[in-house]
A protein has these predicted regions:
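Active-site rim elements
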Residues: 59, 203-211, 222, 234-237, ...
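Catalytic-site signature segments of enzymes, centered on catalytic residues
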Residues: 155, 190-217
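Active-site-proximal structural scaffolding
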Residues: 65, 164-167, 213-217, 229, ...
Length: 278
């Protein structure tokens, strides 16, 4: 059985208090997931809040089992199973994060501590406590789960590491693929479009980890899928190449005789005239 209270290494750059380690309590176990919540935060919730959180995690567990896991693995490939911890369940650690963060993924966790000293030695993702009863929680889980698929498909199977912009582009597209952006108001997509419009001249492939970066890669992924189908994201993920070269290979696989720079230029023009029929 999984331990009730566990000490986890966390990313101080995302943590609300810049901590590197926290104690977390196991709140829920499903067939697929362990939900751990930062102990001090959980203990400070009143019983009604704790009840609301338990209900939210029940719903999220069902959504993961019935939709997120099957849709994303069938489109993009498998995660490491049973992986570094020998357990088919994925750990979801919920802790207090800075306000602009919904979650994160640490690829080091899938390696042993000999290879990655701060590894938690689990297949796991991190979600913000601030999102836990929000409609954006499922989008955040889908996004981070795609990073777990990516580390398996690229780093573990192909022995290459994806470029950040394309890794984020695929993860950003997942809420749309799952139908979570269908109601545009309050969606991840709406947030990203606003961020992009704040800084529409941002580079697509030079990653600075700003909201505008996420906006740019989200819109580029939307454009790619609108024109070439979700296979363009999947084929480039399963390629031994990374970044631009993997997108070009995926285009060629479909018989599209265009370079990345041509596709990029067409996207830029479509943005300029705001006509996605182009």
């Amino acid at each position: 059985a999984a331990s009730q209270t566990v000490s986890f290494n966390i990313d101080s750059s995302y943590d609300l208090f810049s901590r590197q380690e926290i104690e977390a309590e196991l709140i829920r176990t499903t067939q697929d997931l362990y939900f751990y919540i930062e102990k001090s935060w959980w203990d400070s919730r009143n019983s009604q809040e704790q009840n609301d959180i338990r209900l939210a995690l029940f719903d999220l567990g069902e959504e993961f089992r019935n939709k997120i896991y099957p849709v994303l693995t069938s489109n993009f490939g498998s995660i490491p199973e049973p992986g570094i911890d020998g357990d088919q369940r994925i750990t979801v650690l919920i802790h207090q994060m800075r306000q602009d963060a919904g979650g994160y993924f640490n690829s080091g966790d899938v390696y042993s501590r000999l290879q990655a000293p701060r590894s938690n030695e689990r297949e796991m993702v991190y979600l913000s406590a601030g999102y836990v009863t929000s409609s954006k929680l499922r989008s955040a889980l889908a996004h981070e789960f795609l990073h777990l698929i990516t580390v398996n498909q690229k780093d573990l199977l192909q022995k290459v590491t994806e470029e950040v912009w394309l890794n984020e582009a695929r993860a950003e597209y997942t809420p749309t693929l799952l139908g979570y952006d269908d109601a545009y108001a309050g969606s991840n997509l709406e947030t990203r479009v606003r961020a992009f419009l704040d800084n529409p001249t941002i580079s697509l492939t030079e990653w600075l980890n700003s909201g505008s970066d996420y906006g740019a890669v989200n819109l580029f992924a939307q454009y790619l899928v609108d024109h070439y189908g979700v296979r363009i994201l999947a084929d480039s993920l399963q390629s031994s190449k990374v970044g631009i070269a993997s997108v070009e290979e995926a285009l060629q696989k479909q018989g599209v005789k265009k370079s990345f720079s041509q596709v990029f230029a067409e996207w830029a023009i479509a943005l300029l005239v705001n006509d996605c029929r182009l």
